[in-house]
Amino acid sequence: MVNVQSAECNYKGVIDNIKKWQDKEEFKKLFTEKAHILWEKDLRDMTLNEVYQTIAYMIRDLVSEDWIRTNEIYAEQKVKQVYYFSIEFLIGRLLESNLLGIDMDDICRQGLEDLGWDLNKVIPAERDPGLGNGGLGRLAACFIDSLAALQLPGHGNSIRYQYGLFNQRIVDNQQVELPDNWLVNGYPWEVKKVDKAVYVRFGGNAYMRPDEDGNLECVHEKYSSVRAVPYDVPIIGYHNNTVNTLRLWRAEYSREQLYQELSIGDRRRAFRYKDSVQQISRFLYPDDSNEDGRRLRLMQEYFFVSAGLQSIVRHYKKKYHESIYKFDRYVAIHINDTHPALVIPELMRILMDEEGISWDAAWNITVRTVAYTNHTILPEAMEKWSIPMFKELLPRIYLIVEEINNRWLKEVRSLYPGDESRARDVAVLWDGQVHMAHLAVLGSHSVNGVAEIHSQILKDSTLHQFYTCFPHRFSNKTNGISHRRWLIEANPQLASLIDDTIGDSWRRTPSKLQDLMPFADDPAFQEQLTRVKKDRKEILARYIRDRYDTDVRTDSIFDIQIKRIHLYKRQTLNILHILHLYYLLKDNPKLKITPRTFLFGGKAAAGYGEAKETIRLINVIAHMVNSDRKVNKQMKVLFLENYNVSLGQLLFPAADVSEQISTAGKEASGTGNMKFMMNGAITLGTMDGANVEIHRKVGDENCVIFGLRADEVMNYYIHGGYSSWQMYSDDAAIRRLMDALVDGSIGGDHFGMLYSAFLDRNDEYFVLKDFQPYCQAQQEIAKRYGDHTKWCHSSVVNIAQSGYFSSDRTIQQYADDIWRIKPVKH
């Protein structure tokens, strides 16, 4: 074991100048004062939520000066700043991460203990903010965390949703969606900035007319105004004085417009206006299976884009005092997928209509300012809006999009005369729809994918025609995760072991986790790592016992798949293997297998029938397995409801096996794979997304890869040759599983939608094709787990190589290659 004193010098000296409470006595004094002001009650009568909120306000007080100073320095030095637009930010709880960020967790813990509270019980009193749902939002959260940690001038921009996606409950084995009223007790981290409110226009009529000088100007009349009020959340840099901002917009009705409607006696119209406005920031991802839902989603997207851009332009003019023609030298705008793609026509609108710039100049500024990250390969997931709805809701924006499309198609047709198929493939407006991905590519100077295989598919297939036109715009930026959240905070036991082994400089420079490689075969280190994993499995087992009244064996393989429920992510492949394993045990009572605990988590979109049926299938099989005494000593199955960031912080550190089994070529990147890896789990996966790069980092011997490759999948799509009915006919195990879906043998239940997806619709995601390879991969997992020394070796290698997948690396690449921003020390 390395003597840490002789290892590379740790960095703790660099945090001496950050503001902090001097000791626990000062903490207790300030806590008491703040609590009396906030709650006006005896400390002994405070609830855990009140204790949490008190500490949150204390932290805000502590960082407020740095928050102000950070923004002052950016303006004084006229540094270029990036604004990261995302429809969601899945930030998770902030109390613990902020305490770690300001290096005050120990003082807070000790002070609370003296006052009679346990910090570990206070932390869960904070609700997970309902500001995001899946990987898109969690990536955005990790990115703004890294921006602040690296002291880069960057901020987030999104919507302050009153309700999150939904709280998931499992009732009678089925997902039930309940309101996620996460703001019910307020949110102490936010600061309402009424003076920064702006107005966003919807509807009305827009047309062009000549002005006094004969130039065309736009007239937009009879529109509805929505007041956008920002709520700012501090994003605290890790052990530095940088405090960036996540700005969240809330929609409010315009009092002037409401009074105007009431003054003409149209009360019904007035209240309809008021309700429609309040809906804009009420729900994350409203159901878009109907016209009203799609209309609301489009309103949400334009609302936060317009509000954010107006705020940015106003700040630029007020603080930078530079020509609007230099805007792109000082401002970078990044759009996280296509939800914020309306940034492009909205910036054009502001530059032309409000700043008086010509079309060509405005377009050049816009393209140089905006960059776009694509997150999807699935054609059905590419965002499109019907032209009539778009035109009615956003008439001025539609005129701009129409002009962008006309100019672009004129250029394409001049380069490729007579090639209408090419024009169709790259048009922004086509077949009655607005194609947002096409708009995003056209209006951005940079287009990136989020894993090497994903970026290559974009160039070769999904956006191939654009790549041939703008090859210089395309690049790859493999996703990353915040090691502060997913290792330091989520797994303090492992973080401490790493500190004791190689020093703590990896906390600042995660690539230094590679210094663990020499310890991969060190018996003493393996023993300590085993103890840490056992402790984390016991913590999760206690949670499962308390929440689900179910005991799980901590000496079993914890095999975990946690992600959004979708057919391409293939939770179905996992649960069919579990059913197959169950049948093997039932058919062979003397058969002994490596004990397993299979854990699932994730939400299905409320309107996605096959995904909801997948959840029902998992729960029915779980009940069947767990209640069978002849089987449940060797395997358990659980679906953990309401998966979120906080639950993830319990699951990732406890995992032995990371299930990353999407159909090859369908997952853009994935970041759960990185979180598992960083906590020492072994990847069981396809060659998809970032799995490809994880495999390259750790090698065949330290992960288990199976299944079709992306080119094989694409070949089947293009040329055919795959028949799921043939798989059914040729494989008795598959036939038994498919029949069980509809013959009532699984808990007396029927799963017709999944049966139809596998057989009647020819198994679009190749679950049956990959079934036997997956079973063999699971056997390989069991074999490797049986050799404890080799398993520990693989676990150490995964941890050591995971530093590459820190979002700090990703963000540094964005900063250097796309945004051209520099760190600002202070």
Feature roles, as predicted:
Residues 2-826:
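A conserved ligand/cofactor-binding region detector
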